[in-house]
Amino acid sequence: MGDGLAGFGAVLQLLPPGSARVNTVRVLRDGEFVVAHSEYNFFGPKIGFDVFRFENGKIVEHWDYLQQKPTQPNPSGRTMTDGTAEVVDADKTGINKKLVADFVDVVLVHGRLHKLAGYFDGDNYLQHNPAIADGLSGLGAALKAMAEKGITMKYSRVHKILGEGNFVVVISEGEFAGQPTSFYDLFRVHKGKIVEHWDTIETILPKAEWKNQNGKFGF
C-alpha cells in the first residue's frame, strides 16, 4: 500500500463494493501506539494485527500483519481470535513486558530451549496458533513435526514490544520455511507466567514489490 490517503484509497478501489468487513476483538494502548487484533474480510477472510501511531490525536503511521483465516479450529478447538480479551493488571504492564521480552530473546531468538519451562505454569498454556495444540506439550509436538518435514523457523530480530496490563505484543523478523517473515505474537500473562498466545505469520514481499519504501518494521 502506498503512503497517505491516496495509497489507502487506491487499495479500497480494488475491493468489490461493500465487501470489506472488520471485527476488532482486542485493543491495547502503549504510549503513542494503539494495537488492534481483528478479523477481516479484506480480499478474503483474514486475521490481522494493526499498529497505529498517533500524534496530536491523529493517526500518522500504520503497520499491519495479516494471515489467511483458517477454515477449521486448531487441534485444541481454538480459533485465531477467541479467548480472553479484557485488559487487566495495568500496574503490571512493565514487569509483564520484561517477562515476555526475556522469553522471546532467550528462547525464540537465541534458541535456549532448556529455559522454556521457566516462563510457563506447567502445561497450562492456551494456544491460538492454527496448527498447534494447547500446552508446552502441544508446542513441542508441533516443533517436532516441523523438523520431520524439514520446515525451519527462526526469529532473528525483535523490532518492537508493546503492552498494556496482561497483554504484550512482540513484533519480530526472521525466517519461516526459508522465506523472510514477519512474526507478530500476542501473549497474555497471569501471575508472572505466560498463559495464552495468539499470532500471525506473514511472508515479507521482495523489496521490488513494495508499494512504499517504509518496510514492515521501521519503528
Protein language model features and the residues they cover:
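C-terminal and inter-domain tail/linker signature
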Residues: 1-219
